[in-house]
Amino acid sequence: MQSSKYRHRLPQLGQKLFATDGGMETTLIFHDGIPLPHFAAFDLLRSEAGIAALRSYFERYVRIARDQGVGIVLESATWRASSDWGSKLGYDAQALADATRKSIGMLLEIRDEFETPATPIVISGAIGPRGDGYVAGARMSPTEARDYHRVQIETFASTDADMAAAFTLNYVEEAIGIVAAARSVAMPVAISFTLETDGRLPSGETLAEAILRTDQESDGYAAYYMINCAHPTHFRHVLQQGEPWLQRIRGIRANASRRSHAELNDSADLDAGDPQTLGAEYRELRDLLPKLSVAGGCCGTDHRHIDAMCRALKAA
């Protein structure tokens, strides 16, 4: 029987600020020069050098959290570790499960070494979309999404991970299915939608529609919602009405770049933006999101951006 530390009392649901990491894949590719076929960071777990690169990556953020006196949510390197993406890299179901457990195990070791009372460390199993994160292509029904993602979520539940979190979701049915799969194994789950430059999901749905429908279809089971892989200038306007559904948003993992998803997809370079400016934009977002407690980054962000976010939010 597993004994997770925070599964039944996620500390980021309180008032304390929690950091996350930045854009893992873009950092590894553009800063560290590590190729990641299909953006699959979990593939690094098959070599000692890859494991060392991932551990070094995570420890950099943990040290920032400790220096700043904030908590941190560590997301496993498993955004691509589901069956469709794994098969593209030659992984069968058992190999994917082994990689998933290894990814969580590494984060547990980091927690054992670095956690302090002032810096609680939450271990989260990262889930990615079945398809392209930027395009709402072939859409699953909620039942199909539940069945597809259940295998990965069951693997997370069998470890000492505290929760699961699904990132870069671009249509609501996939979110509903993921929440249902997590609920079936009593695993806390956060849902993070990605938004286009108009503040809508790639499917055309509004953020309000996505959150409210997911909650309606799952009896509000999701622990909280997030926004990721979009720049604050793309979605700030949808947060300015003060509606009750905004209380469900606790996390932001923004891009460093103001580029659209299409522009990012076609870009051969990394637009890292300005860390201090992004930090200031997070401080403005906190005024619009009363429950914001989880701050991290997505494409183009690195440790500099997370440090700036923490400093700005602590000063707010």
What are the functions of these language-model segments?
Residues 1-316:
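Domain-level signal for soluble alpha/beta catalytic cores
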